[in-house]
Amino acid sequence: MNSLEPAALAQAIDHTLLAADASREQIATLCAEAREHGFYSVCVNSSQVPFAARQLAGSAVKVCAVVGFPLGAGLSASKASEAALTIAAGAQEIDMVLNIGWLKDGLFDEVRDDIAAVLQACGKVPLKVILETCLLDEAQKVRACEICRELGVAFVKTSTGFSRSGATLEDVALMRRVVGPDIGVKASGGVRDVATARAMIEAGATRLGTSSGIAIVTGAGTGAGY
């Protein structure tokens, strides 16, 4: 990323609201904020996609949705179906959670097939793969990134924001080293202020998942939440 100025930071942000109790009013506010501040996308649960798409019609802000979230432990066919249905409903990017248990068990072919099923369902829609790095050791993080690189996904992503902890600079740097320059790295979970956002980008992130986008682009202290 060539600039860390507010406009460039805004275009790196997926403005996020994934709470189970998120209301229509909150989603409408999320979308209005994304329009106002020029965020790249809003990131919402799949059931909120049609409403968010209507709110953002005519704007440059994209609708991103999560799949297999937050555990990643569902059937691969279910994840693929959810991705396809969510795209049909208006999603323009998909963030999926890989099967963490399979990865930790060393079932790498199964992990690959799980991601590949969703990737196929996405077609030309960019797919980000969430590793949930706080649950993995370094070798597992590396293997997950290698699989994602080999499959040609659009991004690898650190975290759901719903587990033990979120993105770290060390994990972002590791992921960037493994996937190389052609795949995006999304840092999510705990990115709540401009200093952290800039540090994540300097470490190799090209996208930030956060509910604190306004605090980041205005420099207004530390945001709360995701």
UniProtKB/Swiss-Prot annotation:
It is an enzyme of class 4 (lyase). Belongs to the DeoC/FbaB aldolase family. DeoC type 1 subfamily. This is Deoxyribose-phosphate aldolase. Optimum temperature is 30 degrees Celsius. Catalyzes a reversible aldol reaction between acetaldehyde and D-glyceraldehyde 3-phosphate to generate 2-deoxy-D-ribose 5-phosphate. In vitro, DERA can catalyze the aldol condensation of chloroacetaldehyde (CHAD) and acetaldehyde (ACD), yielding (S)-4-chloro-3-hydroxybutanal ((S)-CHB), which can combine with another aldehyde to form (3R,5S)-6-chloro-2,4,6-trideoxyhexapyranose (CTeHP), a key intermediate for statin drugs. Keywords: Cytoplasm, Lyase, Schiff base. The active site is at D95, K157, K186. Pfam families: DeoC (PF01791). Partially inhibited by acetaldehyde. After incubation for 2, 4 and 6 hours in 300 mM acetaldehyde at 25 degrees Celsius, retains approximately 61.32%, 42.33% and 34.73% of the initial 2-deoxy-D-ribose-5-phosphate (DR5P) cleavage activity, respectively. HAMAP family: DeoC_type1. InterPro entries: Aldolase_TIM (IPR013785), DeoC (IPR011343), DeoC/FbaB/LacD_aldolase (IPR002915), DeoC_typeI (IPR028581). GO terms for molecular function: deoxyribose-phosphate aldolase activity. SUPFAM superfamilies: Aldolase. One of its GO terms (cellular component) is cytoplasm. The gene is deoC. It catalyses: 2-deoxy-D-ribose 5-phosphate = D-glyceraldehyde 3-phosphate + acetaldehyde. Optimum pH is 7.5. GO terms for biological process: 2-deoxyribose 1-phosphate catabolic process; carbohydrate catabolic process; deoxyribonucleotide catabolic process. Its EC number is 4.1.2.4. CDD domains: DeoC. Pathway: Carbohydrate degradation; 2-deoxy-D-ribose 1-phosphate degradation; D-glyceraldehyde 3-phosphate and acetaldehyde from 2-deoxy-alpha-D-ribose 1-phosphate: step 2/2. It is found in: Cytoplasm. DERA is a potentially valuable biocatalyst for synthetic chiral compounds. However, the poor tolerance of acetaldehyde limits its applications as an industrial biocatalyst. Mutations that improve the aldehyde tolerance represent an effective strategy for enhancing DERA activity.
